[in-house]
Regions:
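Short helix-coil boundary/hinge micro-motifs
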Residues: 1-164
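Cys/His-clustered metal-coordination modules, chiefly Zn-binding fingers
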Residues: 133-211
Length: 211
């Protein structure tokens, strides 16, 4: 099976969809971004511009290789960011710098900036330093292709409830997702995958128990 057909897009946010291009299949690590063509295919699948909007990609193999490398580095930074948020910590500064590097590569750009809590009243109320998302203007480049993904990651940092950032409850699945359900009780990456398999396994165990 073509590994591109294994792309899934039900994480609830673009950044986590990219993160889910690397996972375990059983005990084997599986990376779905093996070539520049894989990245272009993934971008097209999520409706992001690729070769058509950035001719320098289709006309320059080196630029396509840069795109692959940058996508993989961004994916690793997203992993470190969500792990930090789940641990109730600010993302490492170098991951914020990496996001900002991509966020500023577009005609309409964005940047994560530090908001320092200085007033005694705010400090007494338990308010802590945080990151805020600001708009800036900058020039475009090949990195601009990845800006919507970096923007998605930045919005996870500034807007998402860390409690809602989860990994699938199935022990052999590493999919991340943002739980946007009303109940906040989503456990599975997808009911059609891990959810139904877990229910079937539970039913089989009950049927196998001696009466």
């Amino acid at each position: 099976m073509n590994q591109n057909s294994q792309f899934v897009f039900d994480a609830g946010t673009l950044a986590l969809d990219l993160l889910n291009t690397w996972r375990f299949d059983g005990d084997q690590a599986l990376d779905l971004l093996q070539s520049p063509e894989d990245v272009v295919t993934w971008l097209a699948a999520v409706g992001l511009p690729g070769d058509a909007s950035f001719p320098e990609l289709s006309s320059s193999p080196p630029n396509r290789r840069i795109l692959l490398d940058e996508a993989i580095w961004l994916r690793q930074d997203i992993l470190l960011i969500v792990q930090s948020l789940v641990d109730e910590e600010l993302p490492p500064p170098y991951t914020v710098h990496a996001l900002n590097r991509i966020l500023t590569e577009s005609g309409t750009s964005f940047r994560l900036d530090s908001l320092i809590i200085t007033s005694e009243e705010e400090q007494s109320e338990g308010m802590q330093d945080q990151l805020v998302l600001n708009t800036h203007e900058y020039a475009s480049s090949v990195l601009g292709v990845l800006q919507p993904i970096a923007l998605s990651a930045a919005r996870i940092v500034t807007e998402a409830n860390p409690i809602r950032i989860r990994q699938c409850a199935a022990g052999n699945c590493m999919y991340w997702f943002l739980d946007t359900s009303k109940s906040g009780r989503r456990r599975w990456c997808s009911m059609s995958r891990c959810g139904n398999r877990a229910k079937a396994a539970k039913h089989y165990r009950h049927q196998s128990e001696p009466s």
